[in-house]
């Protein structure tokens, strides 16, 4: 799923030169999929009424594969942006459906399985960042991007076999989507999730160009982004596994502190220990993602209802996060560098640390279950 997003950054200078896109326009290649992820997460309830979870995942993987293949068939700027929309649709549906499946089938190991799911997402992103520059050495840039249809097709075949006994998740109880729009707690979860993932979206879009601006080669900058995603995998596996009880705040604060140190390092000492800043930011982002999913799932006992809350959180969150790389691109066009963006995300992490205090377990029921 994630190579559709992470494969673009290491090729951005070549891509911009070939298509004439500005930094703001190039940012849409990351922003549009994230925005579509948000829209489809909000539409998840409507999708589930039309399709089973099994069919939703199958169609999602097909959309991701076609989005990647589109980049080979029509590699101009407009078609490139449309391919990002199609791939984002696929990613959005599958990310809305999987949390409910996880809670239904793995209730007692929910935090661990959510971490494994998140780690798989992020590991795929790291693969896209590391391998794409090397694919580009033997192929045109658009062919290098199109290669990422193959993992999506492989995942489709595996899911077709593995999901044969999966039934439709239903729950007569729990809030419907309309009431979630009137829930302050659901909005708080969405904003919280969005601010965290805004940092991720900006880093996958602009970390390689930032280091290429500092003199690095595309292959080295791609490896650095892959290192960040390796940190995400480690964080997604380690932090949820450490979860005890129902208070997620200590681990969320730990994840945010690592993000804070990573962004400060990118601002102050980018060339001294770049691998350390990338790893710290990655571990913090990777750990925070599944913890946010579990935090939302904790609010409601019914899997389908909890899945709707997670879908709402992801919908609002990804719509907010999708704006982040575009704002970053505008800041780059305005300032000529990326420091303003890293400074903005540093301030946002401090805000997130303050918001985390709102998520005491006692507040789950007081908030009306979402």
Residue locations for each model-derived region?
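Helix-to-loop junctions at the C-terminal end of transmembrane segments
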Residues: 40-52, 235-247, 332
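Extracytoplasmic gate region of multi-pass secondary transporters
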Residues: 8-9, 184-236
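Cytoplasmic helix-loop-helix junction between adjacent transmembrane helices
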Residues: 83-119
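Helix-breaking motifs and short loop linkers at transmembrane-helix boundaries and internal kinks
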Residues: 20, 52, 73-78, 107, ...
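Structural signature of the two symmetry-related core transmembrane helices
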Residues: 55-69, 250-265
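Helix-loop-helix hairpin linking two adjacent transmembrane segments in secondary transporters
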Residues: 75-79, 107-164, 206
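Conserved MFS/SLC helix-loop-helix module at the cytosolic interface between two early adjacent transmembrane helices
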Residues: 39-78
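A late C-terminal transmembrane helix in Major Facilitator Superfamily
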Residues: 303-338, 345
């Amino acid at each position: 799923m994630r190579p559709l997003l992470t494969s673009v950054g290491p090729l951005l200078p070549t891509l911009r030169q070939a298509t004439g896109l500005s930094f703001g326009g190039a940012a849409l290649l990351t922003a549009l999929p994230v925005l579509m992820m948000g829209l489809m997460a909000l539409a998840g309830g409507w999708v589930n009424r039309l399709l089973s979870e099994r069919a939703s995942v199958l169609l999602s993987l097909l959309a991701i594969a076609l989005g990647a293949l589109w980049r080979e068939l029509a590699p101009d700027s407009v078609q490139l942006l449309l391919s990002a929309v199609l791939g984002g649709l696929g990613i959005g549906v599958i990310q809305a459906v999987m949390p409910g499946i996880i809670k239904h089938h793995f209730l007692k190991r929910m935090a661990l399985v959510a971490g494994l799911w998140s780690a798989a997402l992020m590991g795929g992103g790291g693969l896209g960042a590391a391998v794409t520059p090397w694919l580009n050495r033997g192929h045109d840039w658009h062919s290098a991007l199109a290669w990422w249809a193959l993992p999506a097709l492989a995942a489709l075949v595996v899911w077709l076999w593995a999901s044969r006994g999966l039934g439709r998740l239903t729950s007569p109880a729990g809030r419907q989507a309309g009431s979630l729009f009137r829930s302050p707690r659901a909005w708080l979860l969405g904003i919280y999730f969005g601010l965290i993932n805004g940092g991720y979206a900006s880093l996958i879009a602009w970390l390689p160009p930032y280091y290429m601006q500092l003199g690095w080669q595309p292959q080295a900058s791609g490896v650095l982004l892959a290192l960040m995603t390796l940190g995400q995998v480690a964080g997604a596996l380690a932090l949820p596994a450490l979860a005890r009880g129902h208070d997620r705040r200590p681990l969320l604060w730990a994840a945010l502190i690592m993000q804070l140190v990573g962004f400060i390092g990118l601002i102050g000492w980018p060339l001294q220990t770049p691998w350390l800043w990338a790893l710290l930011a990655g571990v913090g982002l990777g750990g925070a993602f599944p913890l946010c999913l579990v935090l939302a799932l904790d609010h409601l006992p019914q899997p389908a209802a909890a899945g709707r809350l997670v879908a709402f959180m992801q919908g609002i969150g990804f719509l907010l996060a999708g704006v982040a790389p575009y704002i970053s691109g505008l800041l780059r066009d305005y300032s000529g560098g990326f420091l303003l963006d890293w400074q903005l995300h540093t301030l946002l992490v401090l805000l997130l640390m303050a918001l985390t205090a709102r998520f005491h377990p006692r507040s789950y029921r007081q908030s009306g279950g979402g």
